[in-house]
Amino acid sequence: NARCLISLALMTGNVGKRGSGLHPLRGQNNVQGASDAGLIPMMYPDYQLVDKDNNKDFFEKLWNTPLDDKKGLTVVEIMDAIHENTIKGMYILGENPAMSDPDLNHAREALQMLEHLVVQDIFLTETATYADVIFPASAWPEKNGTVTNTNRQVQMGRKALDSPGEAKEDWWITNELGKRMGLNWKYKHPKEIYEEMSLTMPSLNN
């Protein structure tokens, strides 16, 4: 429990001085990088709040599209919204809420209730068993890209193996879906995506 660790560090005087502090590991690989890039429902990339007009204006201009300034739902709130019949479809990429949600029975019931579920993953996970559509994704050694570790260091990965069968890189699948939905996405390589990220994330300029 994070609060217990914080309390312990405070009680023992291990906060605010050299060689002290907390450094808890995050739950999954690259969760730090995903958070930095804006995969938090109330934030744009680099932890810029969606309900601040100057942030919204910046990203609307950069992406040339209108954006909603309402905060999104957390994973737990999404499961509640499915039970309330306000969410009817989901696209789950690289997550397994049928095993990771704090209330598994509640989450599994929610996944069963969806009218349409798309899952993109490298394995046929427990969540994928509820899916109407499965996109097979590439594993880490099968693609180019970066991850950000808990220490906020960006680490490059280079493709070492070809993907099996019909598996594709995550960015490619997302890019193709965007194009088929009418978006003018023209990414050809993760390098181009990273260059755009650097425009939105001052934290990368280190």
What are the residue ranges of the model-derived segments?
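Non-catalytic alpha/beta scaffold blocks inside enzyme catalytic domains
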Residues: 1-7, 11-205
